[in-house]
């Protein structure tokens, strides 16, 4: 039954599963199911449970996975041919950690963990995160230059730091890891 949702995956989907934190005798994703997920979605998984066959999964270069545990066991009970878990739904609201996840949510996985973003908020989240990223790059540069103290950068910025940031954006537009058009729009918003 763990293959049913895999068969429904489309390109760019992310397989997100609440497997109730099952560890021993819990894994239902190994290198076979992992290969099937990757073949259909060209993406990876967010899995609140254990996976197995780590070496085989690691052979999938672009198969990104966020999982709770690794265990070499299988989701069939060791005492007979019964499943230790049963699927209760596909494309339904679930919990991953403390987050409620709805079908269609945007999945953002980073080294520090995973975020689930409602699709209607995705554009706002991206724009806000780009501004935060630029502020961080600017702040780190100014800290290395010893122009400002950590206390000044970590606190609400003074008007002079805000003006310096706006000037820095203008000077570096086109050289930053955010598209020039977006940087120019940020500058335009800041200088109204």
Describe each region flagged by the PLM:
Residues 1-103, 116-192:
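Feature captures the catalytic cores and cofactor-binding loops of soluble hydro-lyases/lyases
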């Amino acid at each position: 039954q763990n293959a049913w949702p895999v068969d429904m995956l489309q390109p760019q989907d992310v397989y997100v599963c609440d497997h109730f934190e099952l560890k021993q005798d819990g894994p239902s994703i190994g290198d076979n199911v992992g290969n099937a997920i990757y073949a259909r979605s060209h993406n990876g998984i967010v899995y609140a449970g254990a996976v197995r066959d780590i070496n085989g999964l690691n052979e999938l270069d672009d198969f990104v996975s966020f999982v709770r545990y690794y265990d070499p066991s299988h989701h069939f009970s060791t005492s007979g041919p019964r499943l230790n878990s049963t699927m209760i739904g596909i494309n339904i609201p679930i919990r991953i950690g403390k987050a409620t996840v709805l079908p269609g949510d945007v999945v953002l996985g980073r080294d520090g963990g995973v975020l689930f973003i409602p699709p209607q908020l995705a554009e706002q989240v991206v724009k806000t995160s780009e501004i935060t990223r630029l502020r961080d790059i600017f702040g780190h540069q100014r800290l290395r230059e010893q122009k400002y103290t950590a206390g000044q950068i970590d606190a609400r910025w003074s008007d002079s730091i805000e003006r310096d940031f706006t000037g820095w954006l203008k000077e570096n537009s086109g050289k930053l890891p955010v598209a020039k058009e977006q940087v120019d729009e940020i500058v335009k918003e800041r200088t109204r």
